[in-house]
């Protein structure tokens, strides 16, 4: 019984890491395909919120970007500050900037997403709360 429970818990953690990495990979692909940058990033954000809530890292009525950032930090404790900061910048730029997002913004977003995916793949498991 205990071994089966351990295997199930481990698979859930592995699937969570894969789920989050897949969200970032998919968003990078959308950007590469020329999709609307803001829309792709908002979809990424919404998907992450869904996963983080489902795993118990983010409360349903969260209100601030800081709470979201803390949830990502809790879910991915080994994610580098640089990767988290670049990801925050992408979300903030898409949400709050009024200018047209161009190639430089797209490249920055793709680099941030790719970096986070690479780190998640190195880190491995995400715990359940």
Regions flagged by a language model, labelled:
Residues 1-39, 126-129:
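Hydrophobic, helix-length membrane anchors
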